[in-house]
């Protein structure tokens, strides 16, 4: 677990008193810190003095330590060392920031694949832009530092692009129409008129080309919401009705999933007939995520899936009844507002319900943990399988990470809260503090409604990427050596004094109260916690673009493809297959 907390610096002053040099470390904080965070004694020291008649100057100190076993495993405690040269290597959070140019404005989507970033804009030209993150080889001392390279821009004709995705490089060879001698990347772009383009390009040479186009709208038909109304299924599709691609994701090598309104599509890009392999409509559908082990199991989230806000879909059941909603359902209860979900493993999935997160075990259909810490509605989730961390973002711009590596699920529902901040005070004893704030919300941005909704996040090669108002940020966890100042121990000071003044009689020890010892230990544990992380941002935040690859602009024409008329269906599961 790592924390994003305050920075501090040490300033040392010394003075001479009775030919004895003493050093005092004064801690200067940049931000406000609540005093005496740890109010309970981790170690209780009892001092006793026994008078010896033979030597009145002798002092004997007996210490009895009562250690509570439950506090020894706390991540907020560290081992106190008396070594002046004590150094530990701790994990800290490093942030790289870039201010994108004015050409990258009105961003509509962001997709990631390892170190490649694809942005789409609402402009008519240069509406696809490719970037790449690379290690900073020039400045080796910049631990975890990254450089942002602008690769190329692509102009895709047609309506505005609303969704994008990058196919993984290892799956390129599974696409029949892909030529690896010319191209090395496959992109997907979803437009506001229901079209999805399969695009091939080269990172170095460009030569972007549309391989295939998929028209979703021709497989839909119009029906009215009222059961008493006349069925309009046989009428021509209503072109004025909105049909944007709201979700687009590659699936199972050479397949992809997409969502229009409430309808879920599954396509095979190698199939000669451009009809979907699967089409069904789910009222209130917002997001789809694929099981990482079983690719035929989907998690569906939406605003009309009951209190749980999530449902499971098994594509292997061909009768259309593969949908299952976990948990008890109350027909009179209001449906949860769920906008996203993410699989953690084969049997565990997390979804958002309003301002809270729920971790489900699909084998039992029960909630195992609640993650509470957001003040706004959670609209994005990502999971780092290597570090076992969940990243969540709400509509106010708050980004949090949840460490679930040490969570042990039981029959009782666990409650997880932030480990720092106002919400970390006054929590019950059974509450797990594993949430960390990555980025706090910008109050000025929240007040400006014009910028709301322009926040995109994603996970790429263990780097958490955030895009907000043309500011791109990369968060990474790096190993950072940290010097630990030794505690102010009276025995250590007494030993140094007795070394310099051997001829003088031994000084009588001055006892400090148990409260003072507890205060020093608690402050040291808070300020130099082993898991404390430092927030670093480049200032001023200017783009660090490498001139190795100049921005390339590639325009191309759409191949002549006949547009087929069809009928639209808004809430049923069938589709019309028309021959090409």
Curated annotation (Swiss-Prot):
Repeat among keywords = yes
Q: Which InterPro entries match?
A: Quinoprotein_ADH-like_sf, WD40/YVTN_repeat-like_dom_sf, WD40_rpt
GO biological process terms, alphabetically, are: cell division; cell wall organization
Q: Which residue intervals correspond to the WD repeats?
A: 102-141, 170-209, 222-261, 333-370, 373-412
Give the residue ranges for region: Disordered.
497-534
Family label: Belongs to the WD repeat DSE1 family.
Tell me, in a sentence or two, what this protein's role is.
Involved in cell wall metabolism and required for the separation of the mother and daughter cells.
Q: What is this protein called?
A: Protein DSE1
> What species does this protein belong to?
Kluyveromyces lactis (strain ATCC 8585 / CBS 2359 / DSM 70799 / NBRC 1267 / NRRL Y-1140 / WM37)
Point out the gene that encodes the protein.
DSE1
């Amino acid at each position: 677990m790592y924390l994003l907390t305050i920075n501090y610096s040490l300033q040392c002053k010394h003075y001479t008193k009775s030919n004895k040099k003493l050093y005092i470390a004064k801690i200067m904080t940049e931000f406000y810190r609540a005093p005496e965070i740890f109010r309970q004694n981790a170690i209780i020291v009892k001092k006793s003095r026994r008078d010896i008649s033979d030597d009145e100057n002798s002092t004997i100190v007996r210490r009895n330590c009562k250690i509570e076993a439950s506090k020894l495993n706390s991540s907020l405690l560290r081992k106190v060392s008396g070594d002046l040269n004590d150094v530990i290597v701790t994990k800290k959070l490093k942030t790289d920031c870039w201010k994108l140019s004015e050409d990258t404005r009105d961003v509509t989507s962001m997709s990631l694949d390892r170190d490649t970033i694809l942005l789409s804009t609402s402009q008519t030209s240069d509406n696809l832009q490719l970037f790449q993150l690379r290690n900073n080889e020039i400045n080796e001392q910049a631990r975890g530092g990254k450089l942002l390279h602008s690769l190329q821009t692509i102009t895709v004709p047609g309506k505005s692009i609303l969704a994008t995705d990058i196919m993984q490089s290892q799956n390129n060879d599974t696409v029949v129409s892909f030529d690896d001698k010319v191209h090395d990347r496959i992109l997907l772009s979803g437009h506001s008129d229901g079209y999805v383009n399969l695009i091939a390009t080269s990172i170095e040479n460009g030569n972007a080309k549309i391989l295939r186009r998929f028209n979703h709208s021709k497989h839909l038909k119009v029906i009215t919401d009222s059961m008493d109304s006349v069925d309009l299924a046989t009428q021509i599709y209503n072109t004025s009705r909105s049909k944007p691609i709201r979700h687009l994701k590659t699936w199972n090598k050479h397949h992809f999933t997409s969502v229009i309104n409430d309808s879920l599509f599954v396509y095979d890009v190698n199939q000669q007939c451009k009809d979907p392999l699967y089409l069904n409509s789910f009222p209130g559908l917002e997001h789809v995520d694929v099981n990482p082990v079983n690719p035929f199991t989907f998690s569906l989230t939406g605003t009309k899936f009951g209190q749980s806000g999530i449902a499971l879909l098994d594509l292997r059941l061909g009768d259309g009844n593969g949908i299952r909603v976990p948990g008890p359902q109350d027909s009179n209860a209001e449906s949860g507002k769920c906008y996203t979900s993410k699989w953690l493993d084969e049997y565990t999935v997390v979804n958002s319900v309003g301002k809270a997160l729920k971790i489900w075990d699909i084998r039992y259909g029960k909630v195992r943990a609640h993650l509470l810490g957001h003040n706004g509605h959670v609209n994005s989730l990502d999971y780092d399988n290597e570090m076992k961390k969940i990243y969540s973002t709400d509509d106010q711009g708050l980004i949090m990470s949840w460490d679930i590596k040490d969570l042990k699920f039981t029959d009782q529902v666990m409650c997880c809260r932030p480990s720092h901040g106002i919400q970390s005070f006054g929590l019950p004893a059974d509450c797990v503090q594993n949430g960390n704030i990555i980025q706090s919300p910008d109050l000025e941005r929240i007040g400006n409604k014009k910028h709301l909704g322009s926040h995109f996040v994603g996970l790429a090669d263990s780097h958490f990427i955030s895009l907000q108002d043309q500011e791109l940020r990369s968060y990474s966890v790096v190993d950072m050596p940290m010097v630990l100042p030794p505690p102010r121990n009276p025995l250590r000071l007494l030993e140094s004094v007795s070394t310099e003044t051997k001829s003088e009689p031994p000084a009588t020890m001055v006892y400090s109260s148990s409260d003072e010892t507890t205060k020093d230990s608690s402050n040291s544990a808070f300020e130099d916690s082993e898991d404390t992380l430092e927030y670093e941002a480049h200032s001023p935040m200017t783009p660090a673009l490498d001139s190795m690859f100049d921005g390339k602009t590639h325009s191309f024409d759409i191949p002549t493809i006949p547009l087929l008329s069809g009928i639209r269906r808004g809430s049923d599961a069938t589709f019309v297959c028309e021959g090409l």
